């Protein structure tokens, strides 16, 4: 409807899951599964909301890298863990920023801020390939710029403290790092699917408002578990931005882990949600 602002559910495609603000909750009996997003939707390219969504993803990922990389550097700068926020503080910074940024951007872009989340939602047919590729490019550019601003403000400290780049820690194999990234991303993307499930949103009108909270908390918990192993990637844009700006050989040695792991984890989460939790393939046959 012209002139009426629409409420975009977190992770939603522009077309099928948008509902006017104030839409009443539906019962299970009345609920109808939203149609899958078209695989390729060139019509989106002529819509301002499409370009605005990408800009929102860029700004959100920019802010995410800026705050989190500064937090990581602050912890590494401290002479001992007791003099800084420590691993718990890093985890809170990552989880808290995701909570805040998903809340801010959910109604504009769906609040992905992570190529793995975008990839998982694309596999579940929640958004088109056009939008998925656009989001991933903007997320990566935002991450590079966010890390670049940190280096611009503190060039010597940035290089000396590792620039927040992800690497597999000494004592762990690449396989261990890959496994940590797969499971960590599975937890995140599974939480995204559960928190933004269209059927749950239709039944319980308060769920979309609360969605940023479990998503941010999932990021917090995964960081607590995997910072000692990989520094916690679970977000290829975050890993890419820090690696490009830091640009040391060892930051690229394991970089593939932080793309392959999150994409596998996201794919498994999408498969689990669609096939097991929602059983959509079986419903279509009946």
UniProtKB/Swiss-Prot annotation:
A motif (NPA 1) lies at residues 114-116. It comes from the Eukaryota. Widely expressed. Expressed in roots, above ground and in flower buds. InterPro entries: Aquaporin-like, Aquaporin_transptr, MIP, MIP_CS. Residues 1-54, 113-132, 196-208, 278-286 are cytoplasmic. A motif (NPA 2) lies at residues 235-237. It is a multi-pass membrane protein. CDD domains: MIP. The modification Phosphoserine is found at residue 284. GO terms for molecular function: water channel activity. Gene3D superfamilies: Glycerol uptake facilitator protein (1.20.1080.10). Keywords: Acetylation, Cell membrane, Membrane, Phosphoprotein, Repeat, Transmembrane, Transmembrane helix, Transport. It is found in: Cell membrane. One of its GO terms (cellular component) is plant-type vacuole. Residues 76-91, 154-174, 230-256 are extracellular. Aquaporins contain two tandem repeats each containing three membrane-spanning domains and a pore-forming loop with the signature motif Asn-Pro-Ala (NPA). NCBIfam families: MIP. Water channel required to facilitate the transport of water across cell membrane. Its function is impaired by Hg(2+). This is Aquaporin PIP1-1.
